[in-house]
C-alpha cells in the first residue's frame, strides 16, 4: 500500500491577476508539507505576482489560495501567521540591531518574550550573525541584511516560506548559509516556494519545479519528469527550462 501524501501547505486554484494584460491566468498549484518547490520562468512570466498574491501583498481578481488549510483571501491575518515572505530587496529597520529587530517581529506575531529571545538567539547563531547581534543594521552589507530579513521571517516558526529571488547579489558564503537554513527548515517539515533565475540552485535544492510563461504554468514535476516531458534525457535544468519555454512560445 502506498503511503499517504503529506497535507498541502499551499493550494492555489484558478488564480487570476490582470494588469494591462493577464499577469497570472488561471493558475493551479499545490505544494506539500516538507516540500521545496521552485517556480521558474522568464521575466514577465507572472512568478513574482503569484508570490505576492500568496503573501497577501496583491489581491487576485479571481481564484482561491489556501495556506495550511486556511483561506488566505477570507482570513489573510491567520494565513500570514503561518507563512513568511522574503523579497529580493530585504526590508528591515536600519536603526534596530538584529537582536532588537527579531524580538520586535516576534512580538508582532504574539510570540511570548522568553520564546522570542530564545528563537532570536538560535537564528543569530545559525546565520552567523551573533557577532553583530547588537550592532545597528544600517551599516550592513546586502548579504547580512538578507540574513537578518530571513531570520525575521522565521522567528515565528512559519509552516510556509515564500522567497522571491533570495540569492540575487549575495556572496557565496551568505548564499550557502541561507541555503543550509532552508534545507534544515524543509527537513523539519516546513515548505518552501522560491523563484530564482539561478537555475543550478533550483536544480540542486528543489523537490519539484514549476515553469511559468505568460501567466500560465506550462510544466511541473521533478527534474527527471521535466526532462521526460521535454524529451531531453539527461539535460541540465537550464537546457530543459529553455526548451520548455521555447516550445510554449511556438504553441
Regions found by a protein language model. Name each.
Residues 220-221:
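ABC ATPase "signature
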Residues 63-74, 78-79:
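Conserved ABC transporter NBD signature motif
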Residues 157:
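Conserved catalytic motifs of ABC-family nucleotide-binding domains
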Residues 161-165:
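Catalytic Walker B motif of ABC-type/P-loop ATPase nucleotide-binding domains
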Residues 55:
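Helix-to-loop junction immediately C-terminal to a conserved catalytic motif
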Residues 103, 107, 114-132:
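Conserved ABC ATPase "signature" region
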Amino acid at each position: 500500500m502506498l503511503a499517504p501524501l503529506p497535507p498541502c501547505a499551499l493550494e492555489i486554484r484558478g488564480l487570476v491577476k490582470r494588469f494591462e494584460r493577464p499577469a497570472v491566468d488561471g493558475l493551479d498549484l499545490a505544494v506539500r508539507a516538507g516540500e521545496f518547490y521552485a517556480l521558474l520562468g522568464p521575466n514577465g512570466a507572472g512568478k513574482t505576482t503569484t508570490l505576492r498574491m500568496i503573501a497577501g501583498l496583491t489581491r487576485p481578481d479571481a481564484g482561491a489560495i489556501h495556506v495550511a488549510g486556511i483561506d488566505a483571501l477570507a482570513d489573510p491575518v491567520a494565513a500570514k501567521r503561518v507563512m513568511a515572505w522574503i523579497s529580493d530587496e530585504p526590508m528591515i529597520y536600519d536603526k534596530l540591531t538584529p537582536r532588537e529587530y527579531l524580538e520586535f517581529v516576534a512580538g508582532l506575531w504574539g510570540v511570548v518574550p522568553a520564546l522570542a529571545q530564545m528563537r532570536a538567539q538560535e537564528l543569530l547563531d545559525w546565520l552567523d550573525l551573533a557577532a553583530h547581534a547588537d550592532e545597528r543594521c544600517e551599516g550592513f552589507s546586502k548579504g547580512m541584511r538578507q540574513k537578518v530579513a530571513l531570520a525575521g521571517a522565521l522567528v515565528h516558526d512559519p509552516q510556509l516560506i515564500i522567497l522571491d529571488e533570495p540569492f540575487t547579489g549575495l556572496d557565496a558564503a551568505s548564499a550557502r548559509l541561507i541555503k543550509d537554513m532552508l534545507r534544515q527548515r524543509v527537513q523539519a517539515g516546513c515548505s518552501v516556494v522560491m523563484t530564482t533565475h539561478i537555475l543550478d540552485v533550483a536544480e540542486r535544492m528543489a523537490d519539484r519545479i514549476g515553469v511559468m510563461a505568460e501567466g500560465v504554468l506550462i510544466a511541473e514535476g521533478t527534474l527527471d519528469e521535466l526532462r521526460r516531458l521535454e524529451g531531453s534525457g539527461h539535460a541540465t535544468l537550464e537546457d530543459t527550462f529553455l526548451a520548455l519555454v521555447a516550445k510554449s512560445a511556438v504553441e
